[in-house]
Amino acid sequence: MKINILSLFPEYFKAFQENSMIAKAIKLGHLEINVINFRDFSKEKHQKVDDTVYGGGDGMLLQVEPIDLALESVPNSYKILLSPQGQVFNQTKAHELAKHQEITLVCGHYEGFDERVLEFVDEELSVGDFILTGGEIPAMLITEAVARLVPGVLKKGSHENESFEGDGLLDYPQYTKPAIYKGLKVPEVLLSGNHALIDRWRKEASYSKTLKNRKDILAKRKEKPHEN
């Protein structure tokens, strides 16, 4: 899979590509990351890419032309604008994007984009209801979430029991040695060796954690915790 990232700050992505799972995926040939500085496509003096807002307003807006020209350089990709106004990114969307051979993520900066940029992308995505200085961190977040789903990047089945996978609930609590730490004990059922009981406990714990931390997830579901 190829992921293009349009950014005014390509240096942000250097360490990101050189560490952990992303570096391994690139080395094995499962993933290609192509960072494009869309300032290089500016026709303005001094490669200017922003200007004042029509109708008045604070800050500067990114101009449509350099972004459009940069997008034209990756014609076969599925193009995504990163902005707070977009649909909120989630695991379901990560699976959808992982089906594409090539995607392009457009990172904003300053006060945002000229609205006409939307005419040259396929979709607009947000990573949450908060404001960041630029789209670089959201681009890394989406890149990692999508890359993990590309065949060959992770061991088969290694992501299937994580939060938001399978039944869509949060992951169940997990423990390792020691069995007791400062009086805090690992649940006895996990030490029992009874896999049927362990499986049931994990389903109950997953549901309880989701009920406590993410009621919004349960609001979207109709089934009970032990149905299926």
Swiss-Prot record:
Its main location: cytoplasm. S-adenosyl-L-methionine binds at G108, V127, G128, D129, F130, I131, L132. The keyword Disulfide bond does not apply. It is an enzyme of class 2 (transferase). CDD domains: TrmD-like. It catalyses: guanosine(37) in tRNA + S-adenosyl-L-methionine = N(1)-methylguanosine(37) in tRNA + S-adenosyl-L-homocysteine + H(+). GO terms for cellular component: cytosol. Keywords: Cytoplasm, Methyltransferase, S-adenosyl-L-methionine, Transferase, tRNA processing. Homodimer. This is tRNA (guanine-N(1)-)-methyltransferase.
